[in-house]
């Protein structure tokens, strides 16, 4: 979907974010929003938003930011091919294992993925000199960073009924991961 709308030979994608429905269908694990941020060769920044509408992702097209803040030449594009099913399964399983080993007697069940954000921090125009001087900074600016949230319910808690609505308490746990799939709970 993203590759259909963003020509990666002309633009460098630096951030892609997926979010589930945060309304009536929350906890149903339905991907509803996709946001993509990218830069063109003239250092213009763009945001492209997709929303699930009637079973299809739609977009109004990219929005160009008025300010030039990031360097196209120095920024490393996000490797979309690295974000595949195997990688997602790997970090999801590691995150779930961290939660299960951390809880005290709670019977938590994974209900949904609330958000995934994949990012290679773009090099800001104000840091181009630092990028040119520092090999360490250059290496840091090429690393994919992942933030994600998983939603759990405690099976020992009963749902609450408020009129005709059923309210389920859930716990959101935030995680970070790297390109190698190492996962940590995000403080």
How would you label these PLM feature ranges?
Residues 46-56, 111, 116-118, 171-177:
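Broad, structure-driven detector of short, well-ordered beta-strand segments within folded domains
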Residues 60-118:
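Long, charged/polar, surface-exposed segments that mediate recognition or autoinhibition
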Residues 2-6, 38, 95-103:
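Sec/Tat-exported extracytoplasmic proteins
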Residues 1, 27, 31, 48, ...:
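Generic detector of leucine side chains in alpha-helical contexts
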Residues 2, 26-35, 42-75, 85:
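Compositionally biased, low-hydrophobicity segments enriched in charged and small polar residues
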Residues 1-2, 177:
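Charged interaction patches that mediate protein-protein contacts
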Residues 4-49, 122-173:
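Exposed beta-strand-loop-beta-strand "reactive/processing" segments of non-cytosolic proteins
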Residues 54-80, 164-187:
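A short, surface-exposed interaction/processing loop segment used at functional sites
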């Amino acid at each position: 979907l993203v590759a259909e709308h963003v020509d990666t030979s002309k633009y460098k994608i630096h951030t892609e974010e997926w979010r589930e429905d945060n309304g009536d269908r929350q906890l149903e694990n339905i991907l509803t929003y996709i946001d993509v941020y990218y830069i063109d060769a003239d250092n213009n920044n763009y945001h492209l938003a997709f929303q699930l509408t009637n079973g299809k992702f739609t977009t109004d097209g990219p929005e160009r930011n008025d300010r030039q803040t990031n360097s196209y030449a120095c920024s490393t594009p996000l490797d979309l091919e690295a974000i595949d099913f195997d990688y997602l399964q790997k970090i999801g399983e590691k995150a779930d294992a961290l939660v299960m080993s951390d809880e005290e007697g709670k019977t938590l069940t994974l209900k949904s993925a609330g958000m995934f954000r994949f990012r290679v921090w773009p090099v800001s125009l104000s840091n181009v000199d630092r990028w040119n001087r520092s090999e360490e900074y250059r290496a840091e600016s090429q690393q994919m960073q992942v933030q994600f949230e998983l939603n759990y319910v405690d099976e020992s808690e009963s749902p609450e009924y408020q009129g005709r609505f059923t309210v389920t308490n859930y716990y959101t746990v935030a995680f970070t991961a790297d390109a190698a799939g190492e996962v940590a709970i995000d403080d």
